[in-house]
């Protein structure tokens, strides 16, 4: 809803500043959309800002590399941090403000309260990264309290995360509408991700195979092929393309994320979600697509 303007994005670094800004907007009759990120922004992130702008009159993005969602040995220290570039990108899509809190601002000394979304956090990525969704739910709950938005937009590329946040909002009664934004892809189908920056040229050339394999599997299952057959073929294709390890390629219920039977075809009219996680070199890529028969 924002019109083109020349004003730069407002930089906000504390909870009090952010709440004062949002309060002033709301008192003036504005509505507020929020897009939390960890920075290293790409077109996928910017599309989430633009989706929020379809619903609200003001948009806020946050950039915070959340230590609570990284386990020892993961890439917290090496995760790309590009504050200046990110702010320029947000300004290019007329984002009104960017929230850049410190760790101390998000987790004041002595904080002991965390948010755990049972069941949804323990499947799929939760098996391989058991710390991850507890860190995500906790930081997003805190960011919601800081930003107090009317609408928040999360990418469907992180589909399990989106479902965890939706459940948390429902269970805790946050008065926030959660919207999923479509996955942005490169020309070869690879889902845009900040971690794609880790890929070597050879790895990048091979990485699109994860989407190609999923797309073929989804098409076959939509025509009645057994999931077990389609998923096995997808795994083989991914490994042959140069991925070194697969964590999972699985078909799940879109809402509960519970695995669907692999030995029976999808029923006519049934909807499912195909999710995958695999390693190429030292980089773990995830992706998902919808499947409908």
From Swiss-Prot:
Q: In which pathway does it act?
A: Cofactor biosynthesis; (R)-pantothenate biosynthesis; (R)-pantothenate from (R)-pantoate and beta-alanine: step 1/1
Q: Look up the EC number in the record and give it.
A: 6.3.2.1
**Residues binding beta-alanine:** 69
Alphabetical list of Gene3D superfamilies matching this protein: HUPs, Pantoate-beta-alanine ligase, C-terminal domain
**Binding residues for (R)-pantoate:** 69, 161
Name the GO terms of the biological process aspect: pantothenate biosynthetic process
Say which enzyme class the record assigns: ligase
Do you know which InterPro entries this protein is assigned to?
A: Cyt_trans-like, Pantoate_ligase, Pantoate_ligase_C, Rossmann-like_a/b/a_fold
Assigned keywords, A-Z:
ATP-binding, Cytoplasm, Ligase, Nucleotide-binding, Pantothenate biosynthesis
The catalytic site is made up of 45 (proton donor)
Q: Which residues bind ATP?
A: 38-45, 155-158, 192-195
| Cellular component aspect of the GO annotation | cytosol
Could you tell me what reaction this enzyme catalyses?
Answer: (R)-pantoate + beta-alanine + ATP = (R)-pantothenate + AMP + diphosphate + H(+)
| Leader sequence segment | none
* Molecular function (Gene Ontology), one example: ATP binding
Its subcellular locations are: Cytoplasm
User: Whom does it interact with, and what assembly results?
Assistant: Homodimer.
The job of this chain, per UniProt, is described as: Catalyzes the condensation of pantoate with beta-alanine in an ATP-dependent reaction via a pantoyl-adenylate intermediate.
Family, according to the entry, reads as follows: Belongs to the pantothenate synthetase family.
The further comment given in this record reads: The reaction proceeds by a bi uni uni bi ping pong mechanism.
Instruction: Read off the PANTHER family from this record.
Output: CYTIDYLATE KINASE/PANTOATE-BETA-ALANINE LIGASE, PANTOATE--BETA-ALANINE LIGASE
Q: Which NCBIfam families match?
A: cyt_tran_rel, panC
The record's listing under HAMAP family reads: PanC
**What's this protein's name?**
Pantothenate synthetase
What organism is this sequence from?
Hyphomonas neptunium (strain ATCC 15444)
């Amino acid at each position: 809803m924002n019109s083109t303007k020349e004003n730069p994005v407002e930089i906000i670094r504390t909870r009090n500043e952010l709440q004062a800004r949002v309060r002033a907007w709301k008192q003036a009759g504005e509505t507020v959309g929020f897009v939390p990120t960890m920075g290293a922004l790409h077109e996928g992130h910017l599309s989430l800002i633009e989706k929020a702008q379809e619903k609200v009159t003001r948009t806020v993005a946050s950039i915070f590399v959340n230590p609570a969602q990284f386990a020892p040995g993961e890439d917290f220290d090496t995760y790309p941090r590009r504050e200046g570039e990110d702010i320029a990108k947000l300004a290019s899509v007329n984002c009104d403000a960017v929230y850049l809190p410190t760790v101390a601002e998000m987790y004041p000394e002595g904080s002991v309260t965390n948010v755990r979304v049972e069941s949804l956090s323990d499947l799929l990525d939760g098996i391989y990264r058991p710390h991850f969704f507890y860190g995500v739910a906790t930081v997003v709950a805190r960011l919601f309290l800081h930003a107090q938005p009317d609408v928040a937009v999360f990418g469907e590329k992180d589909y399990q995360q989106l479902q965890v946040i939706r459940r948390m909002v429902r269970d805790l009664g946050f008065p926030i509408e959660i919207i999923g934004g479509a996955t942005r892809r490169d020309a070869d189908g690879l889902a845009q991700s900040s971690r794609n920056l880790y890929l070597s040229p050879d790895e990048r050339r091979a990485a699109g195979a994860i989407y190609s394999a999923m797309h073929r599997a989804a098409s076959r299952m939509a025509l009645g092929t057994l999931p077990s057959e389609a998923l096995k073929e997808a795994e083989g294709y991914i490994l042959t393309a140069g991925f070194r390890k697969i964590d999972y390629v699985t078909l799940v219920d879109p809402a509960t994320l519970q695995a669907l039977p692999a030995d029976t075809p999808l029923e006519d009219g049934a909807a499912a979600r195909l999710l995958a996680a695999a390693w190429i070199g030292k980089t773990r890529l995830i992706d998902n697509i919808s499947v409908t028969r």
